[in-house]
Design a protein with these regions (language model features):
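Conserved ATP-driven helicase/translocase motor core recognized via long
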Residues: 51, 167-354, 455-456, 585-586, ...
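Core structural elements
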Residues: 93-106, 159-184, 333-339, 357-367, ...
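Active-site-adjacent bridging/hinge elements
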Residues: 32, 107-113, 311-315, 333-338, ...
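Conserved catalytic motifs of ABC-family nucleotide-binding domains
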Residues: 792-833
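Helicase C-terminal subdomain and adjacent C-terminal extension
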Residues: 653-656, 672-674, 803-804, 820, ...
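Conserved ATP-dependent motor core of P-loop NTPases, especially the RecA-like helicase ATPase domain
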Residues: 15-17, 49, 53-60, 70-264, ...
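Accessory N-terminal region flanking or inserted into the helicase ATPase core
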Residues: 1-21, 31, 51-53, 121, ...
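Conserved motor-region signature of P-loop NTPase helicases/translocases
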Residues: 1-67, 126-128, 136, 143, ...
């Protein structure tokens, strides 16, 4: 393979702390594997494969990387069979530390459990088991607090407990705990969360960092407002523009005056000095441009007003008073969270289990210690591991968090010895919900030098070997203007765009491969999905459809299997697309993560288990009677029910067996009751997964569902249910009754795993998947659909930022009103900005999956207005 100069820099640079910013499609994995091979086979190198620590994001990636290294070594030994070093490396490949961070932590804990007095027989708990234990622990804890009737707790409960599970006090605890787990010392982090609420005087509040944060954040927001107004100014100055230069200039000067202030009170006063202006437009000007300028000005004033009302409405005295009043609520939330953390840890200890967070924190405890002054230093275990590893390689570094950073730093050489190699792409950091911290990548990106002689250096791989030039140009065009340091954390224009490295047959009509954006006028997703289906029929037409290039540069028409539909979320959306494709005769499969428990086959089998456990349940009993398992008709059930007046359907069946008037129905009832009696006896001594298997086989239900539309997936759904039953047995619960409770708990906790996936490698089928699932993959043709979705809602009753500040509501008991504290309003603003950055990165991932053709769709009820808005938003870029 011919490597680029930049790739060779990655492969050959040694004895440095290296950050590789590897853009989408830049051959990151191939380069990383080549670096490993180069290090362990270089005659001048003394590095063995088991002296490298290679950390990947997924098990599949770790397995693939180890296999690639093995294959490269085997190829090398074929060319040079007498090379003792290569033979040695092949023999050591089994001991190579190429794994996920979770597996690496597990290894540390299992090999050093005695250092932290841990039971060596622990097991990693099933995620569902952890959710169940967590819910039980919180429930028991809150019950204890309710019984104690502590005044501060009761006040908090009154404030936050109304509504659904996700809106009440339990969610507050879980949310704070989840954030804490992304930090190296969760308990310490939680304890410090309420520091801002510990103030007792106005002077303390004025000296806090909060007011400075508000001012700095407002300046960034004002930057954006001024940029929009500058766009309006440019339009006004055009030949046929509305000529509203004086009014816009006056408005911009007023806003600039706000931006100059470095003090909260002065900035608050400056806001009140802004006067709106009327932009009437010059006589004979272009009416469309006049409206465009007026709309921009209106939106700018709306943004300005919202910024003022959210962050500058209150005086310093009023804000301080709210903070002081909120102290008891915040301190109780922290107390509850710390109590939960202890009880949760104790419960896991009793059961001899841990979760992945525990594993990481136990590993950290083994590797790092703290002295009396709070200084952290590596333990003997960490120092020994650091001696063993010649280099640490971290793949997908943009998805690391603080805990992982501390773990890997603790086993690096440190102390002036540079041996950490990090590779990733911050533009593809899309796991903020898992506490990924892209700021770790960005800090190094900003501080590392491109001079490879420096101890800490960075190498940028910007050449994309995946996509056609048309796709690359589209991605660059979009992100040059929307991904900036303020929104996205990185300036895309400044050397972070893609360059085309892929070679495609340029004889294919270029127009076929240009990116297309369609805004569908319609009522909702159904209209958009139908449009997409018809577009797929168009591009797969055997005579006039789109042509793509296969390996070897052979041209052919697009097939269904070349096409992937990407969605931000599959929940409630993928079914609509599946139906639209089916209606248009297009075979499709969705990698769905929702709807599993709603599928008819799963509901039927779970109902059967419920009846086996307790037949006095009319709905599950009626469900299985009219199902293909037993094939009763609704009329037959009506006859059975009408003949005897009984409270329960099961009693009706028992009586009908003896006294029923219809001989045919009587035979069916007897057959069912005998069957049920047999299975109730079996359930006592066989495992639940065996019971499920016998049930679907002996009733012929498995054959029936396999013959239905989507039969393959339905069969796999039942197989997945059996797997859940196996997992249930493994976590020590027993019996049908507890399994039913287990399934109910899964549904209650919103742990719907989605329908079983189907391998479609050899099927000519359109694939539907989430953008997150598509990361790392590539497809000839990509439809990015349902692009109208908004960001996260601002409905959380408690918000937390990365610095450990908690934002809560302040309740006025006298007026019976609730309002967010200034801390909550600021955090909500910051979180919205971070959410926007995450959405940009998700968009980047989606667009860079396409190899040859990219199609983007959305739906709107008012097409004319949408087009007008798009024109306005694109004005800045039209001439560039």
């Amino acid at each position: 393979m011919k490597w680029t100069d930049k790739q060779l820099d990655v492969i050959n640079t040694r004895n440095r702390n290296i950050l590789v910013s590897a853009a989408a499609g830049s051959g990151k994995t191939a380069v990383l594997v080549e670096r490993i091979i180069n290090m362990i086979t270089d005659e001048e190198s003394d590095v063995n494969i088991d002296e490298l620590l290679v950390v990947t994001f997924t098990r599949a990636a770790a397995s693939e990387m180890k296999e690639r290294v093995r294959a490269a070594l085997e190829e090398a030994i074929e060319k040079n069979p007498d090379n003792e070093n290569i033979i040695k490396q092949l023999s050591l490949i089994h001991n190579a530390d190429i794994s996920t961070i979770d597996s690496f932590c597990a290894k540390i804990v299992r090999e050093n459990f005695d250092k932290i007095d841990l039971d060596p027989n622990f097991r990693i708990a099933d995620e569902t088991e952890i959710k169940m234990i967590k819910a039980d622990v919180i429930g028991e804890m809150l019950e204890d607090y309710y019984l104690e009737a502590d005044e501060k707790f009761m006040s908090l409960a009154k404030q936050y407990s109304a509504g659904r599970l996700k809106d009440n006090i339990e969610e507050l605890i879980e949310q704070l705990y989840k954030n804490a787990c992304g930090h190296s010392d969760p308990e310490k982090w939680v304890k410090n969360c309420g520091n801002i609420y510990n103030i007792k005087t106005l002077e303390e509040f004025e000296n806090s960092e909060l007011l400075g944060e508000i001012v700095n954040f407002a300046k960034l927001e004002l930057d954006g407002i001024l940029e929009d107004l500058n766009t309006a100014l440019k339009i006004s100055m055009e030949t046929d523009g509305p000529g509203c230069v004086d009014g816009l200039t006056q408005l911009m000067e007023s806003i600039s005056e706000i931006q100059k202030q470095n003090n909260y009170n002065k900035m608050r006063l400056a806001f009140r000095g802004v006067k709106s202006v009327t932009l009437r437009g010059a006589k004979g000007c272009d009416e469309a441009k006049k409206k465009q300028v007026q709309d921009i000005k209106k939106k700018a004033m709306d943004r300005l007003g919202k910024l003022e009302s959210e962050l500058f409405e209150q005086t310093v005295e009023e804000m301080a008073a709210d903070i002081i009043k909120s102290h008891d609520s915040v301190s109780m939330i922290i107390k509850l969270t710390l109590d939960f953390m202890k009880r949760f840890a104790d419960k896991k200890g009793e059961k001899g289990i841990m979760d992945f967070n525990d594993q990481a924190h136990f590993a950290l405890k083994i590797l790092l210690s703290e002295d009396e002054k709070g200084n952290v230093y590596p333990t003997d275990v960490a120092r020994q591991m650091a001696e063993n590893y010649k280099e640490i390689m971290i793949d997908e570094y943009q998805d690391s968090n603080y805990v992982q950073e501390d773990i890997l730093n603790s086993v690096s050489k440190g102390q002036g010895v540079n041996n950490i190699f990090m590779v990733g792409d911050v533009k593809q950091s899309i796991y903020r919900f898992r506490q990924a911290e892209p700021g770790l990548f960005l800090h190094k990106y900003d501080t590392y030098s491109q001079d490879l002689t420096k101890d800490c250096c960075k190498i940028i791989l910007d050449k994309n070997f995946r996509s056609r030039r048309e796709v690359i140009n589209s991605v660059n065009y979009i992100f040059n203007y929307i991904m900036t340091e303020k929104v996205g954390g990185i300036n895309y224009k400044n050397g972070n765009g893609l360059t085309c490295g892929a070679k495609y047959d340029e004889s294919i009509n270029k127009q076929d491969n240009s990116t297309e954006i369609f805004m569908v006028e319609g009522e909702g997703r159904e209209d958009e999905a139908d449009f997409v289906a018809k577009k797929i029929l168009e591009i797969t037409d055997p005579e006039n459809g789109l042509k793509i290039t296969e390996e070897g540069q052979n041209k052919r028409r697009v097939k269904y299997s070349d096409i992937t539909i990407l969605l931000r979320s599959l929940k409630g959306v993928s079914d609509i697309y599946l139906q639209a494709l089916e209606d248009n005769g297009i075979p499709a499969v969705a990698d769905s993560k929702t709807g599993y428990y709603r599928t008819i086959e799963v509901r039927t089998v779970v109902s059967a288990l419920s009846v086996i456990d307790n037949p006095y349940q009319d709905i599950p009993l009626a469900t299985i009677l009219i199902s293909p398992m037993f094939s009763f008709t609704e009329n037959e059930l009506a006859v059975i029910k009408a003949e005897n007046i009984c409270e329960y359907l099961y009693d009706n069946l028992l009586l009908y067996k003896e006294t029923g008037s219809d001989a045919e129905i009587k035979v069916k009832v007897k057959g069912f009751l005998d069957f049920l009696d047999d299975y109730r006896k079996r359930s006592v001594y066989i495992k639940v997964y065996e019971l499920i298997e016998q049930l679907v086989n002996e009733t012929g239900y498995d054959y029936y569902i396999s013959s239905m539309p989507g039969g393959k997936r339905r069969h796999l759904n039942i197989e997945a249910l059996k797997e859940k039953a196996v997992a249930y047995e493994n976590i020590s619960y027993k019996g049908v009754f507890n399994f039913i409770r287990y399934i109910e708990k899964l549904q209650y906790l919103d742990s719907d795993d989605g329908e079983a996936g189907i391998s479609q490698e050899n099927d000519n089928t359109v694939k539907i998947m989430s953008i997150h699932k598509s990361k790392g993959l590539q497809f000839p043709v990509v439809f990015l659909c349902d692009t109208n979705g908004g960001g996260r809602n601002d409905t959380d009753k408690i918000v937390v930022d990365d610095n450990g500040n908690i934002g809560v509501d302040m309740i006025d008991e006298n007026l019976k009103v609730k309002s967010p504290t200034i801390v909550k309003r600021l955090i909500r603003r910051k979180n919205k900005q971070e959410d926007m950055a995450e959405r940009l990165r998700i968009l980047y991932v989606a667009l860079t999956r396409a190899k040859e053709k990219l199609i983007i769709t959305g739906v709107t009820k008012k097409l004319t207005k949408t087009i007008s808005d798009l024109k306005e938003s694109m004005y800045n870029v039209k001439d560039e």
